[in-house]
Amino acid sequence: MPDSEPSETEDRKDDHVRIIREEDVESGGTGLGDVRLVHEALPDVHYDDIDTSIPFLGAELDAPIVIESMTGGHANTTDINRALAAAAAETGIAMGVGSQRAGLELDDEGVLESYTVVREAAPDAFLYGNLGAAQLKEYDLETVERAVEMIDADALAVHLNFLQEAVQPEGDVDARGCLPAIERVVDGLSVPVVVKETGNGFAAETARRLADAGVDAIDVAGKGGTTWSGVEAYRAAAVGASRQERVGELFREWGVPTAVSTLECAAEHDCVVASGGVRTGLDVAKAIALGARAGGLAKPFLEPAASGTEAVVERIEDLKTELRTAMFVTGSPTVADLQETDYVLLGGTRQYVEQRGD
């Protein structure tokens, strides 16, 4: 391993984990609180017979739960990724790593291990890689395949985070040409491609463009969970970038709420992951009723991961129990049945959906 100071990218990854753990970076307002599943008093199913498994990008998961892309790119994150991956394997759910740009561009064995550890810890789990759309424009297909090979990935997520980049002191704000770059990767990559937001969600129009580009899944990552604008505001404050700090604070609440984004994306694509402020198995159930294939969570796993694999497993089993209970009291023996269950929209989410539908 080279004897050198941490790179700017490594420092940024370490900052992100620290800020998310220590600071108030929740935006709130997922809209899931406005979703009411209709109770079935005669569910006509045995609780123990409820099947939470789903098909997902050519594989089968034991439950429609995804550990969302969080970290990697700094030696300090290796243990976190190890715990997350091992827990995903033990519980039969999917997991993504954070952006692999550092692993591709830095000659550092410690950085590389922060990614490769996931496949070592989870030989049979569904794992997906992660690159930014801005990087796809710079990388040829062979380089993108290296990201897949790095963790023997089952899929690749391409993240869109241009609000974060606009606030980030060292951000890349050239958003031109991303869709053609995504299409090129979709056409040539050896594994399925998921396009995901990073806390600001997708509107239907963007989801339609992605569906037309042939992406295999859309991860909404809507407004309501971790606000990366807020995270970058803390980083900007730390380096005295006061203007970017103010912009970051101003846009903390920006985006399409998770519930709305899930509805709009599910109308355009048949494989949607609902994430962004998803915190419980009931939230997952609501998202599936809105049309999602699965629900994704990130921050709720961060503290358990610091304690080790078993703490993450316990959190996942809690989610599974909450989801199974929601399926039971809606009379949904399978996840496909849950997708068809009745729900009611209330409050601001109903207003948002009605206005967007006009």
Swiss-Prot record:
Residues reported in the UniProt entry to bind substrate: R12, K13, S99, Q100, R101, Q164
Cofactor: FMN; NADPH; Mg(2+)
Gene this protein is translated from: fni
Pfam families: FMN_dh
Function as written in the Swiss-Prot or TrEMBL entry: Involved in the biosynthesis of isoprenoids. Catalyzes the 1,3-allylic rearrangement of the homoallylic substrate isopentenyl (IPP) to its allylic isomer, dimethylallyl diphosphate (DMAPP).
Name of the protein described by the UniProt record: Isopentenyl-diphosphate delta-isomerase
Known catalytic reactions: isopentenyl diphosphate = dimethylallyl diphosphate
Subunit structure: Homooctamer. Dimer of tetramers.
PANTHER family per record: ISOPENTENYL-DIPHOSPHATE DELTA-ISOMERASE (PTHR43665:SF1)
One term of GO molecular function: oxidoreductase activity
Binding site residues for Mg(2+): E165
SMART domains: IMPDH (SM01240)
Species this protein is from: Natronomonas pharaonis (strain ATCC 35678 / DSM 2160 / CIP 103997 / JCM 8858 / NBRC 14720 / NCIMB 2260 / Gabara) (Halobacterium pharaonis)
Family listed: Belongs to the IPP isomerase type 2 family.
Swiss-Prot/TrEMBL keywords: Cytoplasm, Flavoprotein, FMN, Isomerase, Isoprene biosynthesis, Magnesium, Metal-binding, NADP
Main location as per UniProt: cytoplasm
